[in-house]
A protein has these predicted regions:
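Non-catalytic pre-domain segments flanking phosphatase-related domains
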Residues: 1-30
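Basic, amphipathic juxtamembrane/active-site segments
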Residues: 40-63, 142
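Substrate-recognition element of Asp-dependent hydrolases with the DxDx(T/V) motif
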Residues: 61-85, 95-96, 132
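Short, acidic/turn-prone active-site loops that include or flank metal/cofactor-
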Residues: 97-102, 143-146
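Conserved Lys-Pro-Asp/Glu-containing loop-to-beta segment of HAD-superfamily phosphomonoesterases
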Residues: 102-129
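Acidic, Mg2+-coordinating phosphoryl-transfer loop and its flanking beta/alpha structural elements
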Residues: 120-153
Length: 153
């Protein structure tokens, strides 16, 4: 069994391209399934769903908050696993089971006094598209739906 640590350094050209990209961003709206997880669901014989969350994503959200960017979860699913992960990260802004993610996002923007240009959105699938196209900065994971990747900055 290998004990080698993963290589986490970003290529210098990517860092140079990112300079100034987040200027003016005050909040980050993120989906959960497919963004904080790998998108897979494991279902037990009793119907209980299990998800895998990556610790690096959680660390990134904590760093955003420490940097003054408000992390906001807007997820279409509601599950004990998602609520637990959000609570473990200490995030206080989240909407669970959002049938209309755009309406949920509008509520958060109004509550926090934000405009779309001040918001980054991280989404991976069709329900995230209305948010991604309005965001001041749109992001999508590498394994996101092609349409989500196409609108990402």
């Amino acid at each position: 069994m290998s004990t080698a640590r993963p290589h986490l350094q970003f290529p210098p050209e990517l860092l140079l391209q990112a300079q100034g990209v987040g200027d003016g961003i005050r909040a980050a709206i993120f989906d959960v399934d497919g963004v904080l997880t790998d998108g897979r669901l494991f279902i037990s014989e009793h119907g209980e769903a299990f998800k895998a969350f990556h610790v690096l994503d959680g660390h990134g959200l904590k760093l955003l908050a420490q940097g003054g960017i408000v992390p906001i979860g807007v997820t279409g699913r509601d599950s004990p696993a998602v609520r637990r992960r959000v609570a473990d990260l200490g995030l206080s802004h989240a909407t669970y089971g959002a049938g209309d993610k755009l309406a949920a996002a509008h509520e958060w923007l109004a509550r926090l006094g934000l405009a779309w240009g001040e918001v980054a959105v991280i989404g991976d699938d069709w329900p995230d598209l209305p948010l991604l196209v309005r965001a001041g900065f749109a992001c999508a994971p590498a394994n996101a739906h092609a349409e989500a990747r196409a609108v990402a900055h």
